[in-house]
C-alpha cells in the first residue's frame, strides 16, 4: 500500500490532523494500523496513537439513529427545531419568549392550572405551630421616613440664600 500523505502534526487520541503532500512512501503491511474491530454494537479502536482514528464508523452509526425533533415556525419567518427531550423548556428569540409546550404556555399566560394564579391559603408556612405559645412578631418595623436631612449630614443652606457675588466669582 502506498501513502502519499504524512502527518504534519499529531494529536493524541484525536481525529484531527493536518496532512501535507510528500513523496510516496511504500509500506510493507497491507493492513491499516488503526483498523476498527467491531463486537456487536460497540466499536473498539486500536490503541496506536500514530494515526488518528477514523471517524467513518461514528458517522455510519449516526446515520442510522433518527433524531426526534419538532419544528416551530415563528412569526418573524424563522424556523426553530428543538429536541423532544427539551419539550418543557422555552426559548427566547429576538427578545420574545416562546413556549415549547402546553404546560409552559399555561404557566406564562396564566391558565387555570398556572401556578401564578393558584391560591395557596394565604402563604401559610407548613411548619406546625402551637397556638398556646406566644410568638413574637418576626417582622421588623422600618423607621418612618421624614422630609428633613439625615442626622449624619448637617443641613445645607439653600442655593437661593447665597449672594450673587459668590456666583460671579465662579463663572468669570
Swiss-Prot record:
It is found in: Host nucleus; Host cytoplasm. Keywords: Activator, DNA-binding, Host cytoplasm, Host nucleus, Host-virus interaction, Inhibition of host innate immune response by virus, Metal-binding, Phosphoprotein, Suppressor of RNA silencing, Viral immunoevasion, Zinc, Zinc-finger. It holds the Pfam family Gemini_AL2. A zinc finger (unnamed) spans 76-93. Phosphorylated. GO terms for cellular component: host cell cytoplasm; host cell nucleus; viral capsid. Its main location: host cell. GO terms for biological process: symbiont-mediated suppression of host innate immune response. Residues 119-172 are annotated as: Disordered. A motif (Nuclear localization signal) lies at residues 56-71. Residues 158-172 are annotated as: Transactivation. One of its GO terms (molecular function) is zinc ion binding. Residues 137-152 have a biased composition (Polar residues). InterPro entries: Gemini_AL2. Belongs to the geminiviridae transcriptional activator protein family. Strong activator of the late viral genes promoters. Enhances the expression of the capsid protein and nuclear shuttle protein. Acts as a suppressor of RNA-mediated gene silencing, also known as post-transcriptional gene silencing (PTGS), a mechanism of plant viral defense that limits the accumulation of viral RNAs. Suppresses the host RNA silencing by inhibiting adenosine kinase 2 (ADK2), a kinase involved in a general methylation pathway. The zinc finger and the transactivation region are involved in PTGS suppression. Monomer. Homodimer. Homooligomer. Self-interaction correlates with nuclear localization and efficient activation of transcription. Monomers suppress local silencing by interacting with and inactivating host adenosine kinase 2 (ADK2) in the cytoplasm. Interacts with and inhibits host SNF1 kinase. Binds to ssDNA. This is Transcriptional activator protein.
Amino acid at each position: 500500500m502506498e501513502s502519499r500523505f504524512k502527518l504534519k502534526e499529531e494529536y493524541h487520541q484525536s481525529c484531527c490532523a493536518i496532512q501535507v503532500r510528500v513523496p510516496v512512501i511504500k509500506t510493507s503491511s497491507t493492513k491499516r494500523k488503526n483498523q476498527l474491530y467491531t463486537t456487536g454494537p460497540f466499536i473498539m479502536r486500536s490503541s496506536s496513537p500514530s494515526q488518528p482514528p477514523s471517524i467513518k464508523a461514528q458517522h455510519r452509526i449516526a446515520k442510522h439513529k433518527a433524531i426526534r425533533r419538532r419544528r416551530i415556525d415563528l412569526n418573524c419567518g424563522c424556523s426553530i427545531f428543538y429536541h423532544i427531550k427539551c419539550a418543557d423548556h422555552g426559548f427566547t428569540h429576538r427578545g420574545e419568549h416562546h413556549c415549547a409546550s402546553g404546560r409552559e404556555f399555561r404557566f406564562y399566560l396564566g391558565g387555570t392550572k398556572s401556578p401564578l394564579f393558584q391560591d395557596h391559603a394565604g402563604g401559610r408556612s407548613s411548619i406546625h405551630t402551637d397556638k398556646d405559645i406566644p410568638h413574637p412578631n418576626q417582622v421588623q418595623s422600618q423607621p418612618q421616613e421624614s422630609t428633613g436631612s439625615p442626622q449624619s449630614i448637617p443641613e445645607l443652606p439653600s442655593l437661593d440664600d447665597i449672594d450673587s457675588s459668590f456666583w460671579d466669582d465662579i463663572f468669570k
